[in-house]
Regions:
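Core catalytic lobe of class I
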Residues: 2-222
Length: 222
């Protein structure tokens, strides 16, 4: 990971934040909120892999303390991440780590290292929570199909199970964890994420009117 220094860069002065944003330390921002007032945390933290002055990883013990304070126990906590930072972040809270989404980008990154390593075409989104959160799967459209008849079985991984049958005329499929969204073409921040991707996650884990927090605003996509 990159050293925690500006490497000679001048730190620009931050402009006045627009209404709805708060210019402050993100962890302190979570701590300042009422306890368990956030339904979902969706943020793109610094990975610590570049020379940018702002690319300094958050202190993880303090981060998780603030997360447990502000986010409801049944709230989803989603962090964008990429190797090697995703490994560090996931291992920092294994009791809350549940699974990951993978964003398949339309544009690769890492061209300066193309002769030493494969181009980076994906980024991970790690999902943490204490208790099972609200989950509204965003179904994908496919060809109509017929479900299998009711039957049971015994899996070495999961034990006994019963598979319910029935028919389907609409062809809707449950989503897999690989999501394809186009990269942002004209960015205002070097690591800007697509609005559509963030919207997908917000629809998946929250109901209308619930509170979503982002402690690393960047371009303000969330």
């Amino acid at each position: 990971m990159a050293e925690h220094s500006t490497l000679g860069q001048n730190v620009p002065k931050s402009p006045a934040p627009p209404e709805g944003l708060f210019l402050m330390d993100g962890i302190e921002g979570l701590r300042s909120l009422p306890q368990h007032s956030v339904d979902m945390l969706l943020t793109d933290p610094p990975y610590g892999t570049t020379r940018n002055f702002w690319d300094v990883p958050l202190p993880l013990p303090e981060l998780w303390e603030a997360v447990r304070w502000a986010v409801k126990p049944e709230g989803a906590v989603l962090f964008f991440a990429q190797c090697p930072y995703d490994k560090v972040l996931g291992a920092s809270n294994l009791p809350m780590l549940r699974y990951e989404w993978v964003w398949y980008k339309s544009r690769c990154t890492g061209f300066l290292n193309a002769r030493r390593a494969p181009l980076k075409r994906t980024e991970n989104i790690l999902v943490f929570y204490q208790k099972l959160p609200y989950y509204d799967p965003q179904f994908e459209q496919g060809k109509p199909y017929k479900k299998t008849a009711d039957r049971g079985g015994n899996s070495p991984n999961y034990g006994k199970f019963v598979r319910s049958g029935g028919g389907s005329e609409d062809g809707l499929r449950f989503p897999g964890n690989l999501l394809t969204f186009p990269s942002v073409q004209r960015t205002v921040h070097p690591t800007q994420k697509p609005v559509e991707l963030c919207e997908y996650f917000i629809k998946t884990y929250t109901r209308p009117g619930e509170v979503v927090a982002d402690i690393c605003a960047g371009s303000g996509t969330t």
